[in-house]
Amino acid sequence: MSAIQQMEVRINASMQSLIDFDPDVREYEIEVPSDCFALKFHLKYNPAYYISIRADHDAGRYGFQDLDPAMGDYIAGTEVPYYEYYDGYIVRLDKRQPCFEQDMHMTISVRAGSYEFGEEAYEIHLTRKCLREVRQLFRESVYDDTEYQVTVPYALYVPSDYDPAKRYPIVVALHGTGEREEPIEAILEKMAMATAWAEDSERGHNQCLVLVPQCRIHYNQEDNWTSLVQFINGHSNSPFWPFPQLKAVWNLLRKLVEEYSVDERRIYLTGVSSGGFAVYVLAMEHPNAFAGLIPVSCAANPDKISLLKGIPMWIFHSDDDPLIVPSWTLDPCLAAMDNAGVKYRLTRYPAGRIFWQSGHFAWEACYHSQEVRDWLFGQAI
């Protein structure tokens, strides 16, 4: 009998293994999305064997407890540990900015050893595409808003074969709190909420424009799209007040609608974490403007929920989101929607399905669904 009877390799939210394991096949080739930063290995094996999983890339060798704050986020440990909560081994993938300049190649070794029965070894050769060609299609610029006295850096994708005689939908993608002080390029690198639409568009499917504004810190660290951080810090009575940066995004959007051939019946809005809060707030402020919403890991103001009536939306959240805890964010929001007759679709990942970095990171799954992207582009005012 083989030491390892079953091996599954999964990415966030997926129930399907990236490999079709055969104990007699010792090497496998896999490809993962550009915003994949961890793999979960689930094994069934003979308990007489010791399992060792290692990687030939520094960022793939360690787990949570190996992090040394003094050394930064990428100190290498010795081997990948087993995590009981996830019932598997978590192999981390590099997310430092230089790794996005070219495709990443990495070999993960899985060994089952026994003093009595010897050793079995398997290798998984991984490729992660960097999407550099797609990211280079986004042009960076800066919008100076005179009404709200803020500056909004942004990246804009326009199809390579843009024809002003046609009308194009536009997707507005709003990042979360962690991206306020990063380069815009990093936003495009580390999440697919913008590049996924551009990839489709470049192959002639769901052609569109994509706007990625950035919420820069102007006043203090509580600056965000909304008053979410102020609320968390006890400096606001609500997380739903729009900040000037978000109000300026609306002005920027109107400017682009005038400059480009935009189909105003098909303006779409998506956002993650605090950017998801902003999706709801912006849609409530302009309830007749947006044809569809994809809010991820966030919540809406229950007191104003009726303003969303008539706007199609597909909501994504994880049951074990440790930051936007569903019991006091998502659940009251859904109850208010049901009471107000607001229609929505919901994907609610069970605990443990989003395993890296935590259940909060549901956006590492939803934007890779062709069904989700096609659904959004099927909506129109």
PLM region descriptions:
Residues 296, 314-323, 328-381:
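C-terminal catalytic histidine-bearing segment of alpha/beta-hydrolase fold enzymes
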Residues 188-201, 297-306, 331:
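Alpha-helical scaffolding within the catalytic cores
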Residues 174-176, 317-318:
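The conserved beta1-alpha1 loop
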Residues 177-247:
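Active-site machinery of serine-nucleophile hydrolases
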Residues 72-84, 117-170, 208, 270, ...:
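A domain-start/cap signature at the N-terminus of enzymes
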Residues 1-130:
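Beta-rich interaction/scaffold domains
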Residues 254-308:
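Primarily recognizes the serine-hydrolase "nucleophile elbow" in alpha/beta-hydrolase
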